[in-house]
A protein has these predicted regions:
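Short glycine-rich, acidic/polar surface loops and turns
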Residues: 306-308
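Beta-rich carbohydrate-recognition and catalytic domains
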Residues: 1-87, 95-302, 313-348
């Protein structure tokens, strides 16, 4: 309710979105950097015949702690070419250290389904995979020179992999990569994970967080891991993390009963927000907090409230961003900052 739009989609209409990324601090100048993709209207089941869909990956910089942003990088589909033509751009992730800047991006590319399943591939569609590129500084990022494959799949049960998210220190200081996987039928989605060094991705599990039993029975896509601040009631607890995820009851519209309870169901994509927690020493064992219903629904439009990402600042503040449906059914990126003083009051 307290969130404010920070980046608007290219049009204020149904099917136009911005988001699917994260925010980080630039250690060189202290500015706030943010990555995400512009998505225009279209239908993923028809390729590009009904619209351009994910058309641009962009990086923004804020000099006022997230109140306003200026675009500093923009890459279209041709810029993200990595072995085959890009049809659409989706979730991305940005990591910045003093020595290196890494970008992870998921794209749908012109690829053919494995032989036994080729009849299931819809005309004009491809296969999703995750690529990466890097530079020594943000202003030197150039995917055309450095982009390379990071994660692809040939397993029909997890054929499409997309929407990367990265976090550090889950176990033994390793960087955790989570991502979303879809089967060749596009009937569901899962959350996968692996450990990533910045160069190599260690063996992954494409389904470590099982789908739920009610509102998220069709889809669970983890988009953010947040270490719970060790203050108040959690000051002396073992390291504990929250996992924000997007869910859906079905990936196709269903006819609701005329006398049934009207509710958002997250059709088409993973659109409604859920939450789980887990002790870091027990990873990948997670526990749902949103077992019977989603926790995060937009009060406007379709109810879509997704792609949550939270930056834990050095001073203890939390800066959260997410993609939220508006009254016009567009989905701008919104943000809210929670001060460490407020966090201490909430957790004490």
């Amino acid at each position: 309710k307290r969130a404010n739009p920070i980046i608007e989609p290219s049009q204020d209409n149904d099917g136009f979105w911005f988001g699917g990324g994260n925010a980080v601090r630039d250690p060189h100048d202290g500015s706030l950097l943010l990555i995400g993709r512009y998505r225009d209207a279209g239908d993923s089941r028809t390729g590009l015949t009904q619209g351009t869909r994910g058309r641009e990956l962009a990086v923004f910089r804020s000099l006022d702690h997230g109140r306003s942003f200026e675009k500093i990088h923009s890459w279209d589909k041709s810029d993200l070419y990595c072995g085959s033509t890009v049809l659409s751009i989706e979730g991305s992730a940005l990591r910045v250290t003093k020595r290196k800047v890494d970008v992870l991006v998921s794209t749908e590319k012109v690829r053919t389904y494995p032989n036994p399943l080729r009849n299931f591939q819809k005309p004009g569609t491809g296969i999703w995979s995750i690529d990466s590129f890097s530079a020594t500084r943000v202003d030197r990022l150039a995917p055309q020179d450095r982009i390379q494959p990071l994660l692809t799949s040939s397993d029909p049960a997890y054929l499409h992999v997309k929407d990367p998210s990265i976090s550090s220190g889950v176990q033994n200081g390793r960087t955790l990569l989570t991502y979303c996987a879809h089967p060749y039928t596009w009937s569901s989605s899962t959350s996968g994970c692996g450990t990533w060094s910045g160069d190599d991705l260690n063996p992954t599990n494409p389904d470590f967080f099982p789908r739920g039993s009610t509102w998220d029975v069709a889809a669970t896509r983890i988009t953010c891991r947040l270490l719970v601040p060790r203050v108040g009631a959690f000051a002396n607890q073992p390291a504990l993390s929250l996992y924000f995820y997007d869910g859906a009851e079905c990936l196709r519209p269903l006819d609701a009963h005329e006398k049934g309870v009207a509710r958002a169901r997250g059709y088409s994509c993973e659109e409604l927000g859920g939450l789980a927690y887990g002790f870091d020493r027990e990873f990948p064992r997670l526990h749902r907090l949103s077992r019977l219903a989603p926790l995060f629904i937009s009060p406007q439009g379709t109810g879509s409230n997704r792609y949550v990402s939270v930056l834990a600042e050095e001073n203890g503040d939390l800066f959260a961003t997410w993609e939220r449906s508006s009254a016009t059914r567009s989905q701008p990126l919104v943000a809210h900052r929670l001060s460490i003083a407020r966090i201490k009051r909430l957790l004490t």
